[in-house]
Amino acid sequence: MWQPNECIIQLKSGKLLKFAGPFIEYESIDVPCLLLKNLDDFKLRILKPSVIEECSLTRSKEPILLKLQSEESFESYKSRFAVISKELEWERLSKAVIATEKIFQASTLPRLNYINTNDDRIIFSIQNNDLVFFGATPDEFLEISKDHIFTLYSVAGTSLTSSVDKLENEVSVSSMMNELKKFGINSVEITQSVARSGELYHVKSMLKFRANLSLLGSLIDAIYPPSTIFGYPIKNALRNKQFLMPPSGYGYYGSLVGVLGEFDDGLLFRSICLIRGLEVKNHLVRVIAGSGIVKNRSAEQEFEECQLKLKSILGSIGAS
């Protein structure tokens, strides 16, 4: 259950999409993309909050009643946190993201109200057979404009004043810069803003640079999975993934979805990482959230942050 798939599919419009689950090997993307598999029942929608639309898995307008089926205890989370804390102390990791979950039985399939839960964030729903991952606050990952301006996104930290959250964001940005320098990319414009995800606020950094489109596949191999979702250095995070992932596994959480084609807003490529969302299957709703960990944080603080994120996600479907 909750196992990710991997595919590159061709949409009816001719656009190509790559979907890769976390921690699984996949080939680099060439331009144009290699078509590996065509899934007729695979549906994807990527919209902006300015689009006035509500996405429903059913047309039901009934209140959504969720009955808790399972959740990770604090003691379980704390034991995983202790292992990762040692890795941070020994400087094997400069940042790690520990994810947790709650699983509910739903009375009706949930729907998302995109407009009321986001400020300037991409919104999406993705479906493969009877499993749906959808949410109102994923992370933008990489975009490329028609004039070959690349934009990398980093969203990290939930406090506007905390020095620890500031460090978390700095680690995320510097990890991307380190990878870009390996490609000889040294001229990078960095801008920061505050992004709202439900009731939470995050520091949002955008790294803009010019590069050849042929670098797309190599860049994705180098910077995905990003530190904002799993940790840094990523190789060391992978060695500890059993302590980072939620009890039921990652599923679609953290997976990369990219679309190559021409968009009305002047982009040639846009991609998102599937986080802060819900997995829905047979009226089971799984909510997953992770928190970025650096030195000098406690298990209590990080577990509480995860609970706030879980609550925010549930709020995006009108449940609590």
Whereabouts are the PLM-identified features?
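Terminal domain-start leader segments
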Residues: 1-15, 55-109
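An N-terminal JmjN-like helical accessory module and its immediate linker preceding a catalytic domain
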Residues: 1-43
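An anion-binding catalytic pocket shared by soluble metabolic enzymes
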Residues: 2-6, 12-13, 98-169, 186, ...
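N-terminal leader/transition segments
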Residues: 8-9, 44-54
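Short, surface-exposed beta-strand-loop junctions and turns on beta-sheet-rich folds
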Residues: 16-17, 24, 158-159, 293-295
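Contiguous alpha-helical scaffold segments within structured protein domains
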Residues: 49-75, 79-82, 104-105, 149-247, ...
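Short coil/turn segments at secondary-structure boundaries
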Residues: 94-99, 125-130, 217-218, 234, ...
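Conserved hydrophobic core element of enzyme catalytic domains
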Residues: 213-320
